[in-house]
Each structure stands twice: as structure tokens, then as C-alpha cells.
Amino acid sequence: TSQPLLKNIEPFQDKVTIHYGDMTDGSSIHKAIKSCNPDEIYNFAGMSQVWQSYKSPLTTMDINCVGLIRIIESVLSLELDCKIYQATSSECFGKVMETPQTEKTPFYPRSPYGVSKLYGHWITKNYRESYGMYACSGILFNHESERRGAEFVTRKITIAVAKIKHGLQDVLELGNLDAKRDWG
């Protein structure tokens, strides 16, 4: 779990049991999976900001790529009949060759983050085909929530607008105005 984001589940904490695991530590992942003996695993863990992947490409690969292998290998070594879902990203498409993207659109990732998510997509398929596991990936596009971090553009805008309305801020400051995102 991501420690700073635990506040996002405060309303539900009495209804869930949290099993801690560090995606960079195979033994903690193995221990967490063994302790809860899951029927299903949904891997939403990972470095999720493209700009961070340029500053920390090795950490991005360790968490997003090797971390996934740690999950899958733990399931295999524990001989669990467990379904695995890998959250992948539209960043796998990178420089898109067509709009909208489909299952037939070529992948062309343009960042360490995009490459790491494409790795997750393909390694999930590889394990499914090699071991007959129930393992699948979903390519997620932008998704918004009040729980999303303030560093993301939509939250940056909505938070600033609220502050401006209440006289707590005068201007909305944004970064790269040439950046493009598909919110389709």
C-alpha cells in the first residue's frame, strides 16, 4: 500500500484489513500474499507520474516491472489459485498512431513510465500463456477522483479554482501548457 494515501480509505478502514507490502522487497510481497491467501490480486501499485520516471528510471522499473514479477512469482511459489489483474496505462501507446486507440493500435511508449507499463502488460500475458494462470491486464486511460493527488493537472485546477473563489489564491499556475492528454 502507499502510506501517504491511507487517508483516502479512512471512511472504510473498519471494513478492510490492510496487508503491507513493499514492491521493491520480494519477501514483504510474498509475506503479504501468503498471509491473506487471496482469490484475486489487483495490482494498482507503482510509480504513476511520467516526469518521475525520467528522474528515477531505475526505481520506476524496480517498482513497476520487477514488483509485478514479485507478485506473480509469489502466487506461483505459493501454488495459489489466484486471479491477477495488472493495471496498465495508455502511456503504453505513447506517440499514438491512431485515435481512438484500440486493441490493435501499435505500442510506442515515450517515457520510462510508458515502457514500464508496457512491460507489465506483456509480462502478464507471458505468464498467463506460459503457466496457464488467470492473469490479465487492463489499459487504463485518465481517471479522475477527489482522492487524486494535487500534483495532477485536473486536481491542480479544481483546487486552485476553489481557493480563488474563497479569496485564498489570486492566480492559477500551471506547468507545460502544450501537454496533451486524452480524457475521452
Q: Each predicted region: which residue ranges?
A:
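N-terminal Rossmann-like NAD(P)+-binding domain of SDR-like oxidoreductases, especially those catalyzing
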Residues: 1-143
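NAD(P)-dependent short-chain dehydrogenase/reductase
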Residues: 7, 97-100, 122-183
